Amino acid sequence: ALDFTHAAARKVKTPKYLLGQRDKYTATGIGLALQYDSRDFAPNPYRGLYLNLRETYFPAALGSTETIWRTTFTGNFYQRLWKGCTLAFDAYMEYNTGKEIPWSMVAQLGGGYRMRGYYLGQYRDNGMIEVQAEFRQKIYNRHGIAVWVGAGNVFPSFDRFQWRQTLPNYGIGYRWEFKHRVNVRIDYGRGKHGGSVVFNVNEAF
């Protein structure tokens, strides 16, 4: 697989946030992925297992500003408990190594799929681990709800991982099935310093 990224910061009001790095970076990578997927329906699984391990190499020889290795792992498990109810688990890890990881390439915690309640990039570092468990229940006709709990952590390296910096996450959501097994979701997630609302199509994972 090929991966290309170009990022440029413009009109930076607080240059110190760049930590002395350049205001633009380019990265071109080649990668290899191993995947196993037994989900019954990817956009809204009721049962099954999804595993994906990906390694991507961004060498200077391909035009990358910095030479970087990126490892990502996704593990999802789904189990039907009773009629209309699914229990879903999600685990995600991203780890970037190199002499210097550009601000545009670090792992970013938050967003509309994991750690809902934190905006994307609210916490960022070379490495990130996130886990969540979600209970999904259809209530009546096309209407349903979801509740979840989760946690996440960012860290510069595995040997500097600190449990006390783990961030909590929990929330509740409404589901409307606008066609068979395809949901519109409205989620309200809470984090350490507040919350946010997410509107999207299909489940978070």
Positions of the model-derived regions?
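Flexible, solvent-exposed coil segments and beta strand-coil junctions
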Residues: 8-18, 49-57, 107-116, 151-154, ...
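C-terminal hydrophobic structural anchor segments
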Residues: 136-167
